[in-house]
Amino acid sequence: MPEVPAAGLWPFLLLLAVQVSTVASSTQPWHCAPCSAEKLALCPPVPSSCPELSRPAGCGCCPMCALPLGAACGVATARYARGLSCRALPGEPRPLHALTRGQGACVPEPATPTASGLSSIEKEEAKASMVPERVPPESAEMTEEQLLESFHLMASSSEDQPILWNAISTYKSMRAREMADIKKWKQPCRRELYKVLERLAKAQQKAGEEIYKFYLPNCNKNGFYHSKQCETSLDGEAELCWCVYPWSGRRIPGSLEIRGDPNCHQYFNVQN
């Protein structure tokens, strides 16, 4: 899904909450923008003490030191070392919420003793069964976190999932089940989210279409806006974020648009 952690999944991705039904299509998924020689030249050196290099999280270009066993991890952190995966801590009541905030832990990948004798379909089913708090396809409670960051952390360290493609595929799957009738949705953020996905789905059909920056409304589970909104960047740059009113999505007057955390709670503390 092209998150976006600060440089790209940055947000991402979508992670682990939504299981998408495969949608047959001749179109190609959008991937991260290629890393130019200029961008690579700006990368800081990796410490010589680093035991294992890892691809950058999200759409970044600079190699990073892979996270070791037991290290804190999440959507916007470095990737974990080979043989590990990022999981919410045992007993965590909101696994997805914790992982999107870097509150997971690097643990050994669950063993699959009989994997060699399984078909590809059975392997995928076994993999999906390890996803905590999976949201069934019939669920209409899909936020930006679930759409954008699913399939990011739960993928093995060797996989590179096209995040935006998964978000659009999820949307198409819902439309196929006649579950995303925008006219019936009253919540403002949810309505805008599906309108944006509809536009992206249409743009994806155009041959040669390249989109490296876009905006997906960040909705809460009730269909209203999170006060912090960010663009999604697939070109390795830090995402721009800003603050909005949760009930309308309108920009808060005087709030800044910055690359990083705009600390939106400060505006509500002042007003209250």
Curated annotation (Swiss-Prot):
InterPro entries, sorted? Growth_fac_rcpt_cys_sf (IPR009030), IGFBP-like (IPR000867), IGFBP1 (IPR022322), IGFBP_1-6_chordata (IPR022321), Insulin_GF-bd_Cys-rich_CS (IPR017891), Thyroglobulin_1 (IPR000716), Thyroglobulin_1_sf (IPR036857)
- Motif Cell attachment site: residue span? 259-261
User: Where does the record place the modification Phosphoserine?
Assistant: 139, 157, 169, 255
Q: Where in the cell is it found?
A: Secreted
What UniProt keywords apply to this chain's record, in alphabetical order? Answer: Disulfide bond, Growth factor binding, Phosphoprotein, Secreted, Signal
Residues carrying Phosphotyrosine = 171
Q: What does this protein do?
A: Multifunctional protein that plays a critical role in regulating the availability of IGFs such as IGF1 and IGF2 to their receptors and thereby regulates IGF-mediated cellular processes including cell migration, proliferation, differentiation or apoptosis in a cell-type specific manner. Also plays a positive role in cell migration by interacting with integrin ITGA5:ITGB1 through its RGD motif. Mechanistically, binding to integrins leads to activation of focal adhesion kinase/PTK2 and stimulation of the mitogen-activated protein kinase (MAPK) pathway.
Q: How does it assemble?
A: Binds equally well IGF1 and IGF2. Interacts with integrin ITGA5:ITGB1. Interacts with VHL; this interaction inhibits HIF1A degradation.
Q: What is this protein called?
A: Insulin-like growth factor-binding protein 1
Chain's gene name:
IGFBP1
